[in-house]
Amino acid sequence: MRQQFFAKSIIMAFMVFLTFGCNNKTDSSITIKWGETLAESHPSAQMAIRAGKEITERTKGRVKVEVYTGGQLGASKEMVEAMQIGAQEMLTEGVAQFQMLPSLEILEAPYIWKNPETFDKVVKSDIIEEFNKKLIESGNIRILGTTYYGYRHLTTTDKAVHSLNDVKNLKIRVPEVQMYIAMAEAWGSKPTPMNFNELYLALKQNVVNGQENPLPTINSGKFYEVQKYLILTGHIITARIVTINETVWQKISEEDRKIMLDVVNKNIEIHNNEIKSLENSLISEFEKAGVTVITPNVEEFRDVVLKSVPAKLESRWGKGLFERILQAQE
């Protein structure tokens, strides 16, 4: 009996040791799922892969980052919602997708940016920190860094667009965001909000007549395979943000937070340079693939949008914010 009791005691003690040992190990590390809608070949996805690996290595596994590209964790809207409740820990996404803070979308408003240089100046200013505080309050989401996604241009399946009149009644896929819908309506088009991951098939099956995205995204999404024309409208420079759930952030040590910020922003610089390089080289690549490239009357597109969209969305953005960002570029 004594031997049986002794044996059971040893087994129970061992099980307790394993339980507490496992708990201590779990408590000392955090696993982060970093989501991305774009294909693995896109510079933004590659940025996340590089940064995730480096964060894991430099924190010695205290922060383990797993990167999921190509919308594996869901569509944009689904991932933003998952971020709010902590079901997903990190996300790189366009600012307009964070609809719990409508004013944030102004960072990709049509024709608000003069050029990539003034964009870079503003996103490194106090304006971003103001948005960061508001996003933490409204969505429990923190901004770790802001990326340059590139100029957005229009593509069409079979319609050569040289002027504003050529896009009248054209069914254009836009993100599921009010601002994009308002822009396409100002052009006289028929905006068709659609999940990004459904876009290639929709273009192939002529569900929509066209779409708009930056050149690197047109490339990684292979939209040039199902689009005949590329129209260089340059209507939006999109800001995408690298974000983390605030509750998770507060569980990370100060030392590891510094590592994460350093790694993320270092890789953002690499990413931004890659995007700019691709913007310079991809047009000729698309032409080689059989795409006809058109430079339209850009002022027509710009003027009709600026006459209506900022005023229409001022209640969402906040009075005077559009003008403030214009002035910050001086």
Language model segments and positions:
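Short, low-complexity disordered leader/linker segments with a strong preference
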Residues: 1-31, 330
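N-terminal secretory/targeting leader peptides
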Residues: 22-118, 127, 136-330
